[in-house]
UniProtKB/Swiss-Prot annotation:
GO terms for biological process: arachidonate secretion; lipid catabolic process; negative regulation of T cell proliferation; phospholipid metabolic process. It comes from the Eukaryota. Residues 1-16 form the signal peptide. Pfam families: Phospholip_A2_1 (PF00068). It is an enzyme of class 3 (hydrolase). One of its GO terms (molecular function) is calcium ion binding. This is Acidic phospholipase A2 Cvv-E6h. Keywords: Calcium, Disulfide bond, Hemostasis impairing toxin, Hydrolase, Lipid degradation, Lipid metabolism, Metal-binding, Platelet aggregation inhibiting toxin, Secreted, Signal, Toxin. Disulfide bonds join C42-C131, C44-C60, C59-C111, C65-C138, C66-C104, C73-C97, C91-C102. Its cofactor is Ca(2+). It catalyses: a 1,2-diacyl-sn-glycero-3-phosphocholine + H2O = a 1-acyl-sn-glycero-3-phosphocholine + a fatty acid + H(+).
Length: 138
């Protein structure tokens, strides 16, 4: 059900950050964020709670925290400008909100790439009832 919700949200806004985030993950990690990370662990997907289960789930936890620090904007819908140079994402907006959201997405995409070796299929479609621990602060 959580995966279907993510698909619906992604299809609603063609220009929003969630679609751009999917594109960045594909460019940097070489994987579809929707297929690999939309329902992984306690934090990858819509919402998050408990403790991150591994390094990949921690990427999502940090991304959630980063979005939470984006002030005066909606990180899930704002569009930003970026380029790819030598395999690296360069966030190009002068607007503080757009730049911050782009940086959140860039850091998460790099984190996913760097943690591909530790990706654990046991955390795919991880039951929410396994994420009941007290969350750590951002």
């Amino acid at each position: 059900m959580r995966t279907l919700w993510i698909v619906a949200v992604l299809l609603l806004g063609v220009e929003g950050s969630l679609v751009q985030f999917e594109t960045l993950i594909m460019k940097i990690a070489g994987r579809s964020g929707l297929l690999w990370y939309s329902a992984y662990g306690c934090y990858c997907g819509w919402g998050g709670h408990g403790l991150p289960q591994d390094a990949t789930d921690r990427c999502c936890f940090v991304h959630d925290c980063c979005y939470g620090k984006a002030t005066d904007c909606n990180p899930k819908t704002v569009s930003y400008t970026y380029s790819v140079k030598n395999g690296e994402i360069i966030c190009e907006d002068d607007d503080p909100c757009k730049r911050q959201v782009c940086e959140c997405d860039r850091v998460a995409a790099v984190c996913f790439r760097d943690n591909i070796p530790s990706y654990n299929n046991n955390y795919k479609r991880f039951p929410a009832e396994n994420c009941r621990e007290e969350p750590e602060p951002c």
